[in-house]
A protein has these predicted regions:
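Radical SAM enzyme core and accessory elements
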Residues: 98-100, 104-191
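Homeobox/homeodomain signature
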Residues: 2, 9, 77, 82, ...
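Conserved non-cysteine loop/helix-boundary elements of the Radical SAM core domain that shape
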Residues: 1-48, 55-76
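Short acidic (Asp/Glu) and glycine-rich catalytic loops that position anionic groups and cofactors
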Residues: 47-53, 69-70, 110-116, 134
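Glycine- and acidic
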Residues: 21-25, 51-55, 141, 170-175
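A structural motif corresponding to the C-terminal end of an alpha-helix
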Residues: 38-50, 76-81, 130-131, 135-145
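Flexible glycine/acidic-rich beta-alpha junction loops that bind and position SAM and/or redox cofactors
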Residues: 22-27, 56-65, 79-121, 126
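Solvent-exposed, non-transmembrane amphipathic alpha-helical segments
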Residues: 8, 24, 36-39, 43, ...
Length: 191
C-alpha cells in the first residue's frame, strides 16, 4: 500500500459487495467481513482512499444486514467514500450466472426475463425489496438535487431505520460530521 501512495494512487475501488460472510460465501468472493475491516484500516493508515462498492440487496439480505451496513460505513468513516447508489443496488442474476448452480438460487428465481436479461427474484421479506426501491429513489433524487453524499447517506440510513421499525430521533443537526471531499470517479455504478 505505501508504494501505491508513493506513486500517486489516490483511491482504490474494491468490489466488497457485502459485509455478511454468508452472502460473501454464496457469491464466492474469497474475502470476509474481517478482511474488509483490515483493508479499511490499511488504507486509512497509508492515506489511500478506499471506495468500496456493494450489492446490498440479495435474496439473503435481512433488515439487520441492511442496518449493519449503514452502521459500519458510519463507524469506519466511509460515508463520503461510498456512492449513494451503491447502497440500493440489487443482485442481478443473468443467464450463465454461477449462482444458478446453487439449488437454493434455482428454487427462488423466476423464469428468465429476456427483456431485462436476468432471472428475477424476490426477497423472502417483501419489506427488504421495498427498501431497495426506496433507497434507489433516494439516491436518484439526491443526484438530481446535487445533495452531498453525507446528506444522502443520512436520508438513506433514516429510511432503513424506519423500514426496520427502529425509532428515528428527529434532529435538526446532522448526525454525521463534515469531512473533506474524497477523490472519486464521476460514474458511481461500478460494482
Amino acid at each position: 500500500m505505501p508504494i501505491l501512495r508513493e506513486t500517486g494512487c489516490l483511491f482504490i475501488v474494491s468490489a466488497v459487495e457485502s459485509l455478511d460472510d454468508s452472502v460473501l460465501d454464496r457469491l464466492d468472493k474469497n474475502h470476509t467481513r474481517a478482511d474488509f475491516f483490515r483493508v479499511v484500516e490499511n488504507c486509512f493508515r497509508t492515506g489511500v482512499t478506499l471506495q468500496p462498492t456493494f450489492v446490498p440487496f440479495t435474496p439473503w439480505t435481512t433488515m439487520e444486514s441492511c442496518l449493519d451496513l449503514f452502521e459500519q460505513l458510519h463507524r469506519l468513516d466511509l460515508v463520503e467514500a461510498v456512492a449513494p447508489i451503491q447502497l440500493g443496488i440489487r443482485l442481478l442474476i443473468p443467464a450463465g450466472s454461477k449462482l444458478l448452480e446453487l439449488d437454493e438460487v434455482r428454487k427462488l428465481v423466476g423464469p428468465f426475463d429476456a427483456k431485462a436479461l436476468v432471472y428475477p427474484w424476490k426477497n423472502s421479506n417483501p419489506a427488504v425489496d421495498t427498501l431497495s426501491d426506496e433507497l434507489q429513489e433516494i439516491a436518484a433524487a439526491s443526484e438530481h438535487l446535487k445533495r452531498s453524499r453525507k446528506a444522502t447517506f443520512e436520508r438513506m440510513w433514516r429510511a432503513t431505520k424506519l423500514a426496520a421499525d427502529q425509532i428515528v430521533e428527529e434532529k435538526s443537526a446532522s448526525v454525521l460530521p463534515s469531512r473533506a471531499a474524497v477523490p472519486f470517479l464521476n460514474e458511481p455504478w461500478y460494482c
